[in-house]
Every structure is written in C-alpha cells, then in structure tokens.
Swiss-Prot record:
Transmembrane segments: none annotated. It catalyses: L-glutamate + ATP = L-glutamyl 5-phosphate + ADP. Catalyzes the transfer of a phosphate group to glutamate to form L-glutamate 5-phosphate. Belongs to the glutamate 5-kinase family. Its EC number is 2.7.2.11. GO terms for biological process: L-proline biosynthetic process. This is Glutamate 5-kinase. It comes from Streptococcus pyogenes serotype M6 (strain ATCC BAA-946 / MGAS10394).
Length: 273
C-alpha cells in the first residue's frame, strides 16, 4: 500500500457539502462550522493556503424562510439560495473572525471558467486573496446559473466545482468532506460486507458503475459526482481525499498521513534511462 505523504502540500481546497453543514432537522450545524473554521485557521497559521468550496446556500435559505423542503420551481429555488448565501457568508465571516481569519466570497458560473479572459480574471482574484492571507469561500452562483443547452452555466454540483477550483488554482490537494467515510467497493447501506477503498490509483469502469445514488434532500451530490470529480483531479495531475466530514478536525489527521477516507492518487510511472 502506498504511504500517504502530505508534507509538501501547501495549497489545499476543502469542499464541504450541505449534509455536513445542515442538521437532519434542517437547522444549521453551528458546531461543525466552528470546527471547520478552527481547522482552516490552524492550517493557515502553519503556512498553508486554503480555499473553501462550500455548499449550503439552499439549506440556509430553507432554514431562514422556514420552508420544509426545496421548492420545485426554479425561480423559487434561486430565490431561496440567494437568501441562504448571504446568511451562510455572514455566519462564516463571524466564526472565522473568532480565529482571526479573514474570508472572502467568490461566486462562480461555468462560463466564467470556460472563457480565457474571465478565467484569467478569476485566477488572479484567487491568487491576490491567497497572497493577502484570506480564505476564499467559493460557491456556485445559484441565482443566475442555468442548465440550458444553448447557455449552460451550471457546474452540476459543488463536487465538480471543487475539482474545477482545485484545477484552476493548481492546488496540491483536494479534500472532500461528505456524509460517507469514502469510496466503498459496493454500497455500504445495502451490503454489510462492503469494504472501504483506502487508495484509488485508477478510475475504472467498475468504480464508475458501482458509484450510484443521489444526494440528500438538502444537497445534490451523490457518489458518482465524487468519482467524476476525482477523475477531473487526475486529469489535472492532482490528488484528492474523500472522507467523512462528521469531525472536521480529522482533516488535520489526514494531513499527518493517517489513512482516513479514500485517497485518490495516481501512481507515477518510473522511467528508466
């Protein structure tokens, strides 16, 4: 088994999903957000550069507007997300400030990273913020994103968005926090003998086929989108860890090399002269 070595990792993208930020009751998980802010601030104090990709706008919006479930109407979905995004960033700003860490907001649509001019601008924005010691908090701009064939601006979900952000910022590592322990050889909710894959070097058709199921009622990303995100990370010669976000402090353990979650890392070919 390959040993995980993250000593040389400087720039880290951390992605947290709605299911990790919102309790099953629909209320905001304040303890989880506080832990996340502590972990990221600790990493910043150690000289790391951290970008946070955060879902949760819809979950926050549903809570504020006291709605039981996400609307089926697109315009109402966008309205709820717009309300929730403000609340989410306000809370992040307050809690990160407790740890003397400044944050900023970057809202992206897919067309921004497709066109070279806008891609250059957003890349420069990331670099400027990082150089100032600020944590960029990234989300999709749900209020304006559309998924129409002639003008598709949606990423699909924040799993893919986090892989895109890791690529354009040339991050050393993407850490994806989810409500599952990692990638299993089969669905652990159905099969008791399902085994956690500690290391994945190649995304095979078998892995893609076994990654099924949708996300939670508050979020959208299922296992398939996480596997597809790992594929994007591989295409950018990067690495990714998919792990349970129940205890964000586990991120520090992962960076120490402890074998939590699933490590997606291609095996480098050895060339002989």
């Amino acid at each position: 088994m390959m040993k995980r070595q993250f000593e040389d990792v400087t720039r880290i993208v951390i992605k947290i999903g709605t299911s990790s930020l919102v309790l099953p009751t629909g209320k905001i998980n304040l303890e989880k957000i506080d832990q996340l802010a502590f972990v990221i601030s600790s990493l910043m104090n150690k000289g790391k550069e951290v970008i946070l990709v955060s879902s949760g706008a819809m979950g926050f919006g549903l809570d504020i507007l006291k709605m039981e479930k996400r609307p089926t109407n697109l315009a109402k979905q966008q309205a709820v997300s717009s309300v929730g995004q403000v609340a989410m960033m306000s809370l992040y700003s307050q809690i990160f400030a407790h740890y003397q860490t400044n944050v900023s907001q970057i809202l992206l649509t897919r067309d921004v990273v497709v066109f070279p001019e806008s891609l250059a601008n957003v890349t420069n924005a990331f670099e400027s913020l990082i150089s100032l010691g600020i944590v960029p908090i990234v989300n999709e701009n749900d209020a304006v994103s559309v998924d129409e064939m002639d003008h598709a601006t949606k990423f699909g979900d924040n799993d893919r968005l986090s892989a895109v952000v890791a690529g354009i910022t040339k991050a050393d590592l993407l850490i994806m926090l989810s409500d599952i322990d990692g990638l299993f050889d089969k669905n652990p909710t159905i099969y008791e003998d399902a085994q956690l894959r500690s290391h994945v070097a190649v995304i095979t058709q078998e892995i893609i086929a076994s990654a099924g199921g949708a996300g939670s009622k508050f979020g959208t990303g299922g296992m398939l989108s996480k596997v597809q995100s790992a594929q994007m990370v591989f295409e950018n010669k990067g690495q990714m860890v998919l792990m349970n976000g129940a205890n964000p402090r586990d991120v520090l353990r992962v960076l120490e090399g402890q074998p939590l979650g699933t490590w997606f890392k291609q095996i480098e070919e050895v060339t002989h002269d």
